[in-house]
Curated annotation (Swiss-Prot):
Signal sequence extent: none
Family to which the UniProt record says this protein belongs: Belongs to the universal ribosomal protein uS14 family.
Classification via SUPFAM superfamilies: Glucocorticoid receptor-like (DNA-binding domain)
Name under which the protein is recorded: Small ribosomal subunit protein uS14
HAMAP family: Ribosomal_uS14_1
Organism: Mesorhizobium japonicum (strain LMG 29417 / CECT 9101 / MAFF 303099)
Disulfide bonds: none
InterPro entries: Ribosomal_uS14 (IPR001209), Ribosomal_uS14_bac/plastid (IPR023036), Ribosomal_uS14_CS (IPR018271)
Keywords: Ribonucleoprotein, Ribosomal protein, RNA-binding, rRNA-binding
Length: 101
């Protein structure tokens, strides 16, 4: 089980990313628009820099929904390899069969 503080920190980052997502996208569109004057683009860049760092989507870490483990994460199932194995052995994931040869 991951530290609760790490999981909560990641949840705060998700909430901030959802909250500031549209504003960040609008500012980035202004910054990337070559037809806008340089001063306006620079002001948009300063506004973007003033936003919280944790509101950037890139700072969100994929974590297992069951254990909070940050590594060996299956995106499709949103669980780590260890949780996947445990859930599969318990028969809680339909269609997953333990391999044996």
């Amino acid at each position: 089980m991951a530290k609760t503080s790490s999981v909560e920190k990641n949840n705060r980052r998700r909430k901030l990313a959802d909250q500031y997502g549209p504003k960040r996208a609008a500012l980035k569109a202004i910054i990337m628009d070559q037809s806008k004057p340089m001063e306006e683009r620079f002001r948009a860049q300063l506004k973007l820099a003033a936003l919280p760092r944790n509101s950037a989507k890139i700072r969100i870490r994929n974590r297992c929904e069951v254990t909070g483990r940050p590594r060996a994460y299956y995106r499709k199932l949103k669980v780590s390899r260890i949780a996947l194995r445990d859930l599969g052995n318990n028969g809680q994931i339909p269609g997953l069969v333990k391999s044996s040869w």
